[in-house]
């Protein structure tokens, strides 16, 4: 884990190494200050003049200023190192996530990945900053102060030998109890972020179903779980400072008593006021170093779980990766499913797809229909290798998709997914995801073919209109048409429309299909739809049921051979006829009412 994370230091290695060296210089200077101060006290006691003490006092000021300079420099380098490390770690983690397949994302969940990119990296950054500075400083101060206390205090400083083991035992006991709590709390952070993510992205649904109170309670429960675990941890950690203060202050009382008694009994020959003062000062430094060590242990304990979670992502191998010698060119848009079976998890009991044997020629238009959960989307996801098959093989252009360079394959397989996603930026910028080098004319042509120009031209800024995050400022049908235009700009060999016209009317749907046929005549098209009218002109139509191909044929053939297809077609035609009848009746009633009000023929 440590080796994995330390790889993110890279170009900040110099400042990372410089920080402990500067801290060492700071500590050495600090250790000299009580020693020089003791000599000044003894000089004053012996009646030395100001002139005699000036060299020692000047040296003391010089050492103090040098210590300050070392400390300030260490602070600067520490900040550069920790912030740079966090920046690199975020970059490495985000870059790793970009290589993940859908299966990897399913394993970690998007909310958990967000927590790791934010909260967990912040925790590791804080721990790293403490490790390269305070974790170096505290042990050095403890060792040097302990040594100097024995040099200056002799037997009086033996008290620290009793106190330090007691404090160490207490500290490790607290950490032993706190660590599993911190381990739990970060998993609960995932649940908290998931609640926020679901609520924000689904805000319109929440409000339309008046579920604000339910969502508030759900969020409050997740927040309360985090609070309760943190409170348990803080209750244990609260014992740390009182325990330390009691032990160290008790040690000070014993040192004052023993030191004063020794000064009085020996009349300053064995122990004097200067030695007592320096022993006391070194004791205070020991106290501060112990408190800093306890802070480090607490922070590292908290960050340890975060570090494991980050390392877990960095160490994860993408389930889908490029082969050693990838094929870089897709010959054509032919697709072959060779007895393909697939399940989303190796632990799943049933197959999502079962023994699919299908052959599609290049340029063919294939319609796919089926009930909810019939694995229509799963089938087409395998073509772009968003998932790998469990059994069998999928071939594009006669080559197994696992043998292609992923970028080369996906550049020739354009998908308009069931969930339409737009990104923050202008309409033109979103469309150019299909082709970054597309001219303005090509962008407008793709929008026209997708019937998106009908509403884009109505915006004051046209194609420079800003799209909010997730496309929240455009309707569902508008999003679908923009996503189709984006896919068209790629001019792929295979175009997949996964229920991508469900939010547009049948007239617009027909115009889009006509545009696709004329614009990409040689492109293989797979159209998943719920409306049979969207696929009835396809060369072949696949009827999916329970992860298998139930029937395949053209529209006329399926009306004769497939009961599912025939019933769906009849039902949809009936609903369409009833809808048109209702519209006509409503139109006639409106016209009659208008004529009556105006004193027209209907009134007569």
Regions picked out by a protein language model, each given a short descriptive name:
Residues 10, 16-73, 77, 150-155, ...:
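Transmembrane helix-loop-helix hairpins at lipid-water interfaces of multipass membrane proteins
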Residues 46-58, 148-162, 171, 232-309, ...:
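Helix-loop-helix
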Residues 11, 99-103, 119-128, 132, ...:
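An intracellular "coupling" helix at the cytosolic face of ABC transporter transmembrane type-1 domains
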Residues 14-16, 22, 63-82, 133-140, ...:
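Alpha-helical transmembrane segments of multi-pass membrane proteins
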